[in-house]
Curated annotation (Swiss-Prot):
It comes from Emiliania huxleyi. Residues 100-124 are annotated as: Disordered. This is Small ribosomal subunit protein uS13c. Part of the 30S ribosomal subunit. One of its GO terms (cellular component) is chloroplast.
Amino acid sequence: MVRISGVDLPRNKRIQIGLTSIFGIGNTSADKILTTANLSPDIRCSDLTDEQVSSLRTIIDESYQTEGDLRRVYSLNIKRLTEIGSAAGRRHRVNLPVRGQRTRTNARTRKGKVKTAVAKKKGR
């Protein structure tokens, strides 16, 4: 089992796809990492030698922000936006879409389940 940046890479997948399971590394970053390490993207994760794994670890640790560090940066950025009271921060605070999407219809993922209005009783 190959473990890089605290993530177990899937054994049966190609190393290029396996690297994308690390938060902060996508297809382009995986290509750059493999080029720097002189590895073929077609190698399976289970076929990597200890030497190759250690070279991948050093490249990722030196050049990329991944996993917990990157998640912390994201959350601090959102916290900063809410504290300064920017438009984006206000949208984050009330759980609405931040980047100008419509909300009259749709936006259910961000807004949550539909809250139905309760009808008033007549005659009282």
